[in-house]
Amino acid sequence: DVAPSRGLGDVYKRQVVDVQPKEVSIALLEDKQLVELQSEGRNISFSVGNMYLGRVKKLMPGLNACFVDVGYEKDAFLHYLDLGPQFNSLEKYVKQTLSDKKKLPQITKATILPDLEKDGTVANTLKVGQEVVVQIVKEPISTKGPRLTSEISFAGRYLVLIPFNDKVSVSQKIKSSEERARLKQLLMSIKPKNFGVIVRTVAEGKRVAELDGELKVLLKHWEDAVTKIQKATKFPTLIYEETSRAVGLLRDLFNPSFENIHVNDEAVFHEIKDYVTLIAPDRAGIVKLYKGQLPIYDNFGITKQIKSSFGKTVSYKSGAYLIIEPVS
């Protein structure tokens, strides 16, 4: 584990992760200066990305939709068009998985059934009491339960894995046609049959080892989810939980040029270390558990910078400062 060598003009970058009971926030420091701050709430058990083996509670033919019990106090909403084109294949696979408790059916050997008809109806596709695999696309708000899809996917930093699909599509934001062709060809050669992949913008220029490493992790998420379906004894049941808020935030902000990532919570420290080990094995040593007496943001001078940024006077690196006052 060697930190990237720095020249004289290079900036010392570190991330500081503050984990609190209701919130996790990540500060990015460049030479001790706070340059970015992101925070998200925690403990939302019905988070976007979570997958459930739910049960159809009520059909709503007028809306061409149904309500599904996923364990939330209010039933979740699933529209026919959100069942996804591959619903028939997924449904058949789930039935096989539930009926054979010893052996998992291999998705790579599954026969992909024709796409779901675009102008079909929920009443001809689902029945009350039926088990369905669903993923949350919109978290519950006030009087409404979560919004669902059955077009399930597993998102990583570079790739999104879509079971029962065979296409590889590359983010439109990658402009170079050579790079798009390279990524497409690369993914076609390493992905298993009957899995589709979306290549995200940040995959541009990445080596096969990094992409293959993440693909393996996403495939493992799928296997774990299917194993939970097979072992399910009660419905609804959670089969896949989107990565913790801290890892999710880090996934979008991570850069191998960071020299240290400091975390003040042991469980989150292990999650982040596992994630970094996975995508940049030679950088795993940069993740450090903070055990100091002072709150972590106080220790790194972040609290003071946050207060000054949100206060009346904002100081600049150059020595200038800005005074912000409400207009009377």
PLM features per residue range, with description:
Residues D1-V2:
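Short, well-ordered junction/capping motifs at the entry into regular secondary structure
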Residues S5, G9-S328:
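DE-rich acidic low-complexity regions and acidic surface loops
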